[in-house]
């Protein structure tokens, strides 16, 4: 598989009431095809959030945004553009990071969480020096992270509820 240069095509989802910010790396191939975050049918992000928030699992983009806003959750990614092979985070190179400072300046973010180790490492390298705000790395909801059962993910991710 060849490297492809990808530029992030989604706006961040947040408002002035957002209390936590969840950052991924960048949209997967399936997410880009579906025009929204965590679009791969086997990614457990939306099912996990719905379970933790005691909400129905959102199906449409509008339902996903509604659940995020209702629960004061912002989402975006750490990468604005990069070279990548398919959806493999391990292949990411030539990173241009997003600038999350506007979100932090115009919302009520209490804590930043990153979805997976690669997002955590990139946050630490690129965003932490700009924001001074430590991020909590959570296990990836990606189907590639099959070692983590849904139950284990729920337990690990339940820490986001403290800041909601």
Where are these regions (language model features)?
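C-terminal capping/extension of enzyme domains
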Residues: 1-19, 41, 88-97, 101, ...
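Short, hydrophobic/glycine-enriched beta-strand segments
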Residues: 19-25
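Short loop/turn segments at strand-loop or loop-helix junctions that form parts
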Residues: 25, 78-80, 140
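Short catalytic/ligand-binding loop motif for oxyanion handling, primarily in non-cytosolic enzymes
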Residues: 29-32, 83-86, 120-123, 143-147
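Short, surface-exposed acidic-centric catalytic microdomains
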Residues: 30-91
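A general structural signal for short secondary-structure boundary/capping elements
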Residues: 66-71, 118-126
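Internal catalytic-core helix/loop-beta-alpha segment
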Residues: 70-118
């Amino acid at each position: 598989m060849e490297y492809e240069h990808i530029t992030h095509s989604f706006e961040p989802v947040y408002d002035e009431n957002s209390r936590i910010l969840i950052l991924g790396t960048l949209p997967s191939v399936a997410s880009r095809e579906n025009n929204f975050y965590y679009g791969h049918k086997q990614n457990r992000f939306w099912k996990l959030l719905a379970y933790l928030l005691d909400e129905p699992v959102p199906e449409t983009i509008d339902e996903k945004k509604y659940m995020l806003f209702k629960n004061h959750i912002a989402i975006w990614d750490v990468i604005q553009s990069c070279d990548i092979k398919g959806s493999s985070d391990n292949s990411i190179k030539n990173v241009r990071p997003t600038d999350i400072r506007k979100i932090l300046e115009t919302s009520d973010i209490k804590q930043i969480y990153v979805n997976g180790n690669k997002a955590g490492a990139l946050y630490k390298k690129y965003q932490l020096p700009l924001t001074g705000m430590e991020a909590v790395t959570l296990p990836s909801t990606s189907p590639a992270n099959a070692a983590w059962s849904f139950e284990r993910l729920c337990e690990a991710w339940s820490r986001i509820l403290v800041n909601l």
